[in-house]
Amino acid sequence: LPGARCAYDMTQTPASVEVAVGGTVTIKCQASQSISTYLSWYQQKPGQRPKLLIYRASTLASGVSSRFKGSGSGTEFTLTISGVECADAATYYCQQGWSSSNVENVFGGGTEVVVKG
């Protein structure tokens, strides 16, 4: 029906991960239906607004370190952080973002990255 809204669920794993400085973190996001490459990744630190890291699944946002890499399409997506630094400690969210007015923008549940010094 015109104007009908589609329900999209975004399942993000793991909920929390601990990593040593210099290590690698992999965060996965699964969409309940294909969203092509309309997937963004955000980093949020306590008391701060979310920072866009990656859009269209794999495109690095301006000013973001190339240590962050996004991949995937359809229903399966991955964010990889390599050479982890203390400053990477944060909560990371995936967001589906079809450029269509009849689909809700939906976030994953978030992944807390704890960096061990």
UniProtKB/Swiss-Prot annotation:
Residue segments, region Complementarity-determining-1: 30-40
Region ranges (Framework-1): 7-29
Cysteines engaged in disulfide bonds, as pairs: 29-86
Record region (Framework-3): 63-94
Annotated region (Framework-4), positions in chain: 107-116
Gene Ontology molecular function terms on file: antigen binding
GO biological process, one term: adaptive immune response
Keywords assigned by UniProt, alphabetized: Adaptive immunity, Disulfide bond, Hybridoma, Immunity, Immunoglobulin, Monoclonal antibody, Signal
Other facts: This clone was derived from the rabbit-mouse hybridoma 12F2; the chain produced is a monoclonal antibody against streptococcal group C vaccine.
Protein name (Swiss-Prot/TrEMBL): Ig kappa chain V region 12F2
Organism ancestry: Eukaryota, Metazoa, Chordata, Craniata, Vertebrata
